[in-house]
Amino acid sequence: MNLWDKKAKSYARYNQKLNSIQEQSFKELEKLNINFKDKKIIDIGCGTGVWTLYLAQNAKEITALDNAKAMLEILKEDANKLQLTNIKYENCTFTEWINKNQNAQFDIAFLSISPALQDKKDYLNFMRLAKIRIYLGWADYRKSDFLDPIFKHFNTEFKGIYKQDLESYLLENNVKFHKFIFDETRIVKRKKDEAIENALWHLNMNGVKASKQDLETFVKGDIKETIQSKIKLLVF
């Protein structure tokens, strides 16, 4: 099973109240006069639709692309509740999709904290999709007072893409872009079993095989996790 399919059941879902990252991003996009109304949009690595469903309420149409079927099923369920009919669902990787849709054009190409773009070819294809490209990614190492000690014990680290990513490609190719960096701190409460499952998922993503028993020392009971992130918004 796709690891992101496993993550779907515990992944954040759409909420009409914007989260901190969304609030700060939309505020900055508004300053740049970016308008989503009546636009044709693609949301790459859309997940459960946390952004998709908000954008769809203004867009003419939106393509929701994700390689995790379970994520898209949640998105569809929430879209039905909101009676949104302008969403096209694509269950595949970005590379698979672009190979079948090489001439596709949108008003806005959007990606938020997703590993969907893997290499320079993907970056170039992302750029070619639309006149306006919006990219949200990690600006630095994401800190977690729960996961970091576990990562250290297993001799690994947070693997979110932030050292070499789309920004590196834009700089190498002298592509001008607007950059805005902001912080986000959130506190997540998890039951013991959920915390262990979350830690195992992150270790698995890093190629580390561990068991529930291996994590018993770190998770004595329910936990309260503080996550500190530095996010960057690129618009070009």
Segments predicted by a language model, with ranges:
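Short conserved loop adjoining the S-adenosyl-L-methionine
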Residues: E96-N103
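A short, conserved alpha-helix within the catalytic core of class I
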Residues: A116-L129
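Short alpha-helix
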Residues: K159-N174, H178-F180
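Class I SAM-dependent methyltransferase SAM/SAH-binding core
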Residues: T48-E96
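Conserved class I S-adenosyl-L-methionine
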Residues: M1-N35, K39-G47
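Conserved Class I S-adenosyl-L-methionine
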Residues: H178-F236
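Conserved beta-strand signature within the Rossmann-like core of class I S-adenosyl-L-methionine
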Residues: K131-R142
